[in-house]
Regions:
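Phosphate-interacting basic helix/loop segments used at nucleotide- and nucleic-acid interfaces
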Residues: 4-6, 72-79, 83-99, 220-234, ...
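Single-stranded RNA-binding regions, centering on S1/OB-family and related RNA-binding modules
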Residues: 15, 29-40, 101, 384, ...
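Append "with occasional cross-activation on large, charged helical scaffolds in nucleic-acid assemblies
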Residues: 158, 167, 179, 192-466, ...
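Short secondary-structure boundary/capping segments
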Residues: 20, 34-37, 120-125, 263, ...
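Charge-lined substrate channels and their catalytic hotspots, especially those that engage the 3′ end
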Residues: 1-105, 112-157, 189, 194-197, ...
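Catalytic nucleotidyl-transfer cores of nucleotide-processing enzymes
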Residues: 144-183
Length: 665
């Protein structure tokens, strides 16, 4: 249920509240998304004034809007996205230059043309700050008439865009760039898999299907190879982490799941987006315009110390924290590329990173090994990108400081707000993913799978399954025939009688013992250690993860229930407590399990990153800023202090000035 607390708890009793909505008789997979939206207090209903503003937006580009813009409709720009994507932020085009090198055009949806500073659309977009993506469902930052309509770079229709036009030399370095407003027309809506089949695998059917834009795709692929080499030379960290995706049935239940791997088409787009983001950051920094930058700091000293201790178990070394560079991480990844512990070591390296965040000043990006970085390429789904567009347009169209809508102080407050909203969305996404994993495992209780030990604690082993990447606990009570002692220094469990050892990176076979959708816990039973590790390569298994019955708005309830204003405020916190926002205890998987308090076996601070991040049966590690600038990958979260008022700073008033026309903030 969704309940609103009317009386807070006291020392004698718990809180008292009123039920505002009934989600279902029991927690089912189909309710997981709705519960996450409520418990994380995600705005998902549009205020009337927002819908009114959205309805006033033109559904097609007009002749008046084309005036003053560069016409690039004849260029064969294409969009390359996932098969289930609906909001197309970016389109790309590349051509060889005389004398060598390339011209790369990255065209980004001109959301700032339609969302004016301070109007209802803008205020709601700022409050949300980001779109939140769940399997088969999205809570968008902008109404669908914009996010899936006039702002989306759909094929064969004119769209307004902001362009980053770059010259790139044969070594993959951007030698010059410029920004300008344009009107474009996407010549094809392509998917990563189709592009990879055509230019990577040279599949005849795929090449025939994309024949109209095949020369353009081959140009992009050739350019990507140069940019990838440049990325390697500068030492950017390249984490190859599979993404777990779910296929849902018509009722919202989990039909199948598995891990997907990136191909060159994903990386091609990533490099194009990164290049445009860098140029946006350099453009704004040079002109000293208040804007948001994307900052990623070097690893925190404490986490780096844990990492070094972990690596010593695998005979690996890294320099001191004050000397470490992104290239040092890349070198370790290269060294373990063919080792059976590759994925474990890579995951621990990744979780040792600091969190990326928005900042009002440029601090560089450690993970990408870049001196300047901003988010420019996804204004449909990220508010900071919209702010960057406004800053660039101000620089292109005005020389008067009074024409700019934001002060440095306002931008600093917005950086905190947007970072907090990003963490909230990530927590909600992770919550749903973990519950869907539990729902999938509920169907496989008794089944056996291969996995690797990713955490060792005093109370058992955490094991990640090879194919699905699901993690669960082998409680120490399931390690039979001996009494095991935990070695906190070497991070292993050792049998008192047999001397048998379990340590990080061990390959084991487990049986699914129990899975709880309510508390997001999965328990395994150890079947046997494996004598050999799997080859450190991709599974090669193909999945179709386009969600069945795609939903882009919450389903309406059959029985209407009166909802009080603000029901997703205090009620959200109650639901969060009821459904495990905090880590619940780990229960010993015995026939009659005794639930222990969460503090019975707290993960020690001396444990390696892998162990701490799996404590409680969940991956809680912080993720490095993804190399991709597409839909964000999941990473960790942290509270970053009190949020400022969830309203964007109002545009400054300058006695008697008329409002700026659209697109001229």
């Amino acid at each position: 249920v969704v309940a609103e607390i009317t009386d807070p708890p006291t020392s004698q009793r718990g809180p008292i509240g009123e039920i505002r909505a009934v989600l279902g008789e029991r927690l089912q997979p189909s309710l997981v998304v709705e519960m996450a939206i409520a418990s994380h207090d995600l705005p998902h209903e549009w205020p009337a004034e927002v819908l009114r503003d959205a309805a006033q937006v033109e559904s097609a580009v007009t002749a008046a809007e084309r005036e003053g813009r560069t016409d690039i409709r004849q260029l064969p720009l294409v969009t390359i996205d996932g098969a289930d994507a609906r909001d197309f932020d970016d389109a790309v085009y590349a051509e060889p230059r005389r004398g060598g090198g390339w011209r790369l055009i990255v065209a980004i949806a001109d959301v700032s043309h339609y969302v004016q500073v301070g109007n209802a659309l803008d205020r709601e977009a700022y409050e949300r700050s980001t779109s939140t993506y769940f399997p088969g469902f999205v809570v968008p930052m902008l109404p669908e008439t914009l996010s899936n309509g006039i702002c989306s770079l759909m094929p064969k229709v004119e769209r307004m865009c902001m362009v980053c036009d770059m010259a790139i030399d044969a070594e993959g370095n951007v030698t010059k760039s410029k920004f300008y407003d344009a009107v474009m027309l996407s010549h094809a809506r392509l998917t990563y898999d189709k592009v990879w089949q055509a230019v990577g695998l040279n599949d005849a059917d795929a090449r025939h299907e994309v024949a109209d834009v095949l020369p353009q795709l081959e140009n992009l692929h050739a350019l990507y190879k140069s940019m990838a080499q440049q990325r390697k030379r500068r030492g950017a960290i390249d984490f190859e982490t599979p993404e777990v995706k779910f296929r849902l049935d018509q009722t919202g239940g989990v039909e199948s799941m598995g891990a997907t791997e990136r191909n060159d088409a994903h990386k091609l787009i990533e490099e194009c987006m990164i290049a445009a983001n860098v140029q946006a950051a350099l453009f704004l920094e040079k002109r000293k315009i208040p804007a948001l930058f994307r900052a990623h700091e070097p690893p925190p000293a404490e986490k780096y110390e844990d990492l070094q201790q972990f690596l010593r178990e695998f005979k690996l070394r890294m320099p001191p924290v004050d000397e470490v560079t992104p290239g040092d991480f890349s070198e370790v990844l290269r060294m373990v590329k063919d080792r059976p512990e590759r994925e474990l070591i890579q995951n621990v390296l990744l979780r040792s990173q600091s969190m990326a965040a928005y900042q009002p000043d440029n601090r560089g990006h450690f993970g990408l090994s870049l001196q300047a970085y901003a988010h420019f390429t996804s204004p449909i789904r990220r508010y900071p990108d919209l702010l960057v567009h406004r800053a660039i347009r101000y620089a292109l169209t005005s020389r008067k400081p009074t024409d700019y809508s934001y002060t440095p102080a306002e931008m600093a407050a917005m950086a905190v707000h947007c970072s907090q909203r990003e963490r909230r969305a990530e927590e909600a996404e992770r919550d749903v993913d973990e519950r869907f994993k539990c729902a999938w495992m509920e169907k496989h209780i008794g089944s056996e799978f291969d996995g690797v030990v990713t955490g060792v604690t005093s109370f058992g082993l955490f094991v990640e399954l090879d194919e699905s990447k699901v993690s669960g606990l082998v409680h120490i009570s399931q390690l039979v025939n001996d009494y095991y002692h935990f070695d906190a220094v070497r991070k292993l469990l050792k049998g008192e009688r047999t001397g048998a050892q379990f340590r990080l990176g061990d390959h084991v076979r487990i049986q699914v013992l129990r899975a709880s959708l309510e508390d997001r816990k999965i328990d395994f039973r150890l079947v046997s250690p494996r004598t050999s590790a799997p080859a450190p390569t991709g599974s090669g298994k193909a999945y179709d993860y386009a969600a069945a019955g795609e939903r882009y708005s919450l389903p309406k309830k059959a029985a209407a229930t009166t909802k009080a204003p603000g029901m997703f405020g205090r009620a959200a916190k109650a639901i969060g407590r009821a459904f495990g926002r905090k880590e619940a205890e780990v229960a010993a998987p015995a026939p009659a399990p005794r639930k222990a308090a969460a503090s019975d076996n707290p993960p020690s601070r001396a444990q390696p990153p892998a162990a701490r991040q799996h404590a409680g049966g969940q991956h809680q590690g912080r993720r490095v800023e993804p190399s991709s600038d597409r839909r964000p990958r999941k990473d960790g979260s942290a509270r970053r202090g009190p949020a400022p008022a969830a309203v964007p700073p109002a545009p400054k008033k300058h006695g008697g000035r008329k409002p700026k026309p659209k697109g001229k903030p």
